[in-house]
Amino acid sequence: IGENPKGDQEEGSSDGSIEILGQDIRQFKDWSSISYVPQNGMGGWKDFPASVEEIVRANLYKQIGLFRFAGKKERQQVRAALAQVGMEEYQNRLIGRLSGGQQQRVLLARALVNEPKLLILDEPTSALDEKNASHFYRLLKKINAEKRITVLMVTHDLKRASSYADDIWVLEDGKVKQEAGKGDGQA
């Protein structure tokens, strides 16, 4: 149940279906196979006292156990995720000492450390300059190709997205207004 743009209560659609990784969402149980990168997720954490390594490792607490120390396997997973995004040499630096682009790459590493099948990103480049935004998109395309991770991103930057995405859906008022794919030359 939620509110529509007019402020009226709605229960949602009763027709159609939603599948995640080929499974009906109502029966889906493998939530650890999905990772999320928020919009400008580290904004305002300038004095947050955690290192890059600690931020990434936090996504492994389900695997490690709360209040337990990471073992060799988990430390290797963290290093591998940081290497994927080009941030391995920053692992001991405090997260608040990094640029916005570097922080977003750390959040991407945090999402990748679990080796997800689906990566969901919410406007991940909204706070980045042109150079860092382009680098971030190239990085996502590389990860998608090399790791075979499905990437689902919300963005208002259709021009840039169309250069990297295989498929694009334009939503308006909660409905698909336009759909385009690489095969039809419109993405």
Predicted regions and their residues:
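Conserved ABC ATPase signature
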Residues: L94-L98
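H-loop (His-switch) and adjacent beta-strand-loop-beta switch element
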Residues: I168-G181
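H-loop/switch region of ABC-family ATPase nucleotide-binding domains
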Residues: T155-H156
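Conserved catalytic motifs of ABC-family nucleotide-binding domains
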Residues: E115
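Conserved ABC transporter NBD signature motif
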Residues: S13-D30
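Catalytic Walker B motif of ABC-type/P-loop ATPase nucleotide-binding domains
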Residues: L119-D122
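Conserved ABC ATPase "signature" region
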Residues: R57, G71-Y90
